[in-house]
Swiss-Prot record:
Pathway in which this enzyme or protein is active: Nitrogen metabolism; urea degradation; CO(2) and NH(3) from urea (urease route): step 1/1
Name of the protein this chain belongs to: Urease subunit alpha
GO biological process, one term: urea catabolic process
Xref: NCBIfam families: PRK13206.1, PRK13207.1, urease_alph
Length: 573
């Protein structure tokens, strides 16, 4: 047999163990640590589709029927990037779920074929050779202001949304809340036909426990406490008391003006209970100037929103106007202007960069249309990783490649929000048994534009050329909805996450929904230690006069980035 050079092997079958791949135009490199397809040692047996290729009848394609276990789809020779590792494998999908990561093919003619990856006549092939596969992104901070956010999110690699809203109402523009069972029912119906998993948050700003139980029975997955509705210590305690009894998560936007108390009072009201702290840095809201200190606490699950990711020379200028609009403020009212200015602090925004790189802030969401951009969750995560690589070099354990850093950052918008909100049994990683919510990337466009977004095993969104062309690739190649985005298919491949009490109360019978209703897992005992690769608890101090931030005693100096990757090389605007 003719020997293949590593370069030639990569051209034919994709990279293999020991090969390194640059992510878009960043300084980040990944190195493949394992090739479950056999690599060069089994050259010629790779599962490759096409004319004159392996996956043909009685060659790489066997006789197994679907009833005998053949997968519905195999993604061939793809590099899987997940919090648990960076490997190459064939990925099998059956019934909308991941069934195996290994070697696909025909065991009658090939060695080492995984028993759940036996290619048969019923098997579709997606060529992943030379591409990267990640879990579908989870945006943990979504304002449901307009339905068009779905297209933008899918086009950015997001397949699950956690948040709330009812449309362009003032409450929804400012707060991620779907208040009350009537609004919740209508939103569950409205979102039924989109290729997107949904977890709605109800209003937690009340001391009425029955009001919250009513919302849980109505189909919310948890609660949101927002200062615009009054995040008082009494409301925080009441909401967490109900959440503890129901097993659901609470997301917190605390009191920027410190009217009802300071950060210490909020922490006292939380009383060591699990809570998801939104935009922990504070530009998006929260006790000024030291809300960022909550990221040091074991019971707090901290996240960022993407407008401050990463800290750049333009970050401060755009934030003031955004904030005035989002929170229904007037520049003509001095108190409103002071409120807005108190939230924008370059020192804490700069410290946010470092806390992400340390794994102390565990998640990144968008804050869509409410100071954040829903299509840029993935992109800004990797821009932050790039900026930190330039400033801090390799992380411990990395040498020549950035696997540790990449695994930390991919977890911020996949497994960490899934664990925080009790969704990890269904989504959040590329693992056997989970929904096949997957994003396929060309390495040159990693984090920028997906090659394809697979929702529950079906391609829902993809880069596609002119539909009147003779082949799929002529320009303009644009991200477009595919058959998996059609309403009935989308409902069959997506889920609504709801509180267990909603199912016990018969919500599925009360609403005419096409998709599955899935109960969230009990999250009340979860804390920072449960955030994969993002469980650090450094000491964080903020000077109340100068806003200087010390992390484990050291001042983190502001060095806003003047240039970023994944920007104007890819976008006109």
């Amino acid at each position: 047999m003719t020997d293949l050079s590593r370069a030639r092997y990569a051209e034919l079958f994709g990279p293999t163990t020991g090969d390194r791949i640059r992510l878009a135009d960043t300084d980040l490199l990944i190195e493949i640590t394992e090739d479950r397809g056999g690599g060069p040692g089994l050259a010629g047996d790779e599962a490759v589709f096409g004319g004159g290729k392996v996956l043909r009848e009685s060659m790489g394609q066997g006789r197994a029927t679907r009833a005998e276990g053949a997968p519905d789809t195999v993604i061939t020779g793809v590099v899987v990037v997940d919090h648990w590792g960076i490997i190459k494998a064939d990925v099998g999908i059956r019934g909308g779920r991941i069934v195996a990561l290994g070697k696909a093919g025909n065991p009658d003619t090939m060695s080492g074929v995984h028993p759940d990856l036996v290619v048969g006549p019923s098997t579709e092939i997606i060529a992943g050779n030379g591409k990267i596969l990640t879990a579908g992104g989870i945006d943990c901070h979504v304002h449901f202001i307009c339905p068009q956010i779905m297209d933008e999110a899918l086009g950015g690699g997001i397949t699950t949304m956690i948040g709330g809203g009812t449309g362009p109402a003032e409450g929804s523009k400012a707060t991620t809340v779907t208040p009350g069972s009537w609004h919740t029912a209508r939103m569950l119906e409205a979102l039924d036909g989109w290729p997107m998993n949904i977890a709605l948050l109800g209003k937690g700003n009340t001391v009425s426990s029955e009001s919250m139980w009513e919302q849980l029975r109505g189909g919310v997955s948890g609660f949101k406490l927002h200062e615009d509705w009054g995040s008082t210590p009494a409301a925080i305690d009441a909401c967490l008391t109900v959440a503890d009894a129901a097993g659901v998560q609470v997301a917190l936007h605390s009191d920027t003006l410190n009217e009802a108390g300071f950060v210490e009072d909020t922490l006292a009201a939380i009383a060591g209970r699990a809570i998801h702290a939104y935009h922990t840095e504070g530009a998006g809201g929260g006790h000024a100037p030291d809300i960022i200190t909550v990221a040091a606490h074991a019971n707090v699950l901290p996240s960022s929103t993407n407008p401050t990711r990463p800290h750049t020379v333009n970050t401060l200028d755009e934030h003031l106007d955004m904030l005035m609009v989002c929170h229904h403020l007037s520049p003509k009212i001095p108190e409103d202007l002071a409120f807005a200015e108190s939230r924008i602090r370059p020192s804490t925004i700069a410290a946010e960069d470092l806390l992400h790189d340390l794994g102390a802030i565990s998640m990144i969401g968008s804050d869509s249309q409410a100071m954040g951009r829903i299509g840029e969750v993935v992109l800004r995560t990797w821009q932050t990783a790039h900026v930190m690589k330039r400033r801090r070099g390799f992380l411990a354990g990395d040498n020549g490649a950035d696997n540790q850093r990449v695994q930390r950052y991919v977890a911020k918008y996949t497994i960490c929000p899934a664990v925080a909100h009790g969704l990890e049994d269904e989504i959040g990683s590329v693992e056997v048994g989970k929904l096949a919510d997957l994003v396929l990337w060309d390495p040159a466009f990693f984090g920028v534009r997906p090659h394809a977004v697979i929702k529950g095993g079906m391609i829902a969104w993809a880069a596609m050329g002119d539909a009147n062309a003779s082949i799929p690739t002529p320009q303009p190649v644009l991200p477009r909805p595919m058959f998996g985005a059609a309403p009935k298919a989308a409902a069959a491949t997506s889920v609504h996450f709801v509180a267990p009490h909603a199912l016990e109360d018969g919500l599925a019978d009360r609403l005419d929904l096409s998709r599955r209703l899935v109960p969230v897992a009990n999250v009340r005992s979860r804390g920072k230690a449960d955030m994969p690769r993002n469980d650090a608890q450094p000491r964080i101090e903020v000077d109340p006069d100068t806003f200087t931030v010390r992390i484990d005693g050291d001042v983190w100096e502001e060095q806003p980035a003047a240039e970023l990757p994944m920007a104007q090389r890819y976008f006109l605007f």
